[in-house]
Amino acid sequence: IKETKGDIIIYVDDDALVDSNYIRIYAEHFAAHPDTMAAGGPIEPLYETSEPAWMSPYTKALLTAWMNYGDKVREYPKGRYPGGGNAAYRKEVFDRVGLFNTDLGRKGNLLLASEEKDIFDKMKALGMKVLYLPTPVLHHCIPHAKLEEDYFNRLTLQIGRSERMRTRAIS
């Protein structure tokens, strides 16, 4: 973040694909809406095999980061925020709220999370505008191994640990 030269920082997961107009969509939105401080878009799973029959919207969101709030620009529903793999920020956000808490992020085989939630909570506390944009779609590649019970158990346990660390830091 400190090394970036542009005014807009876009995050894309390393296991994802985006459409050819992805960057342009974010650039045009931020240019036309100077009050938008951050934005995110849909995250659609791209399965190596196929979506399992047991997948519910809840497990789909946990295992694949699936997110879709429709086809209109809007504020995120209460308690929701952009997925970290498909988010764009004005660089000045980090000057105002600080950098990501790297204790919360993924490292090696650890499935910790919530560093984005931490930033968005700080932004919300300052009244910064964060919008959902329906068109910068990210396709999150999901290997079969991420659909197995062992992975689900490790993921949910470590997300819980992350939330504990995050909420202890603000309480």
Regions found by a protein language model. Give the residues of each.
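Glycine-rich, basic loop-to-helix element that forms the pyrophosphate-binding segment
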Residues: 1-4
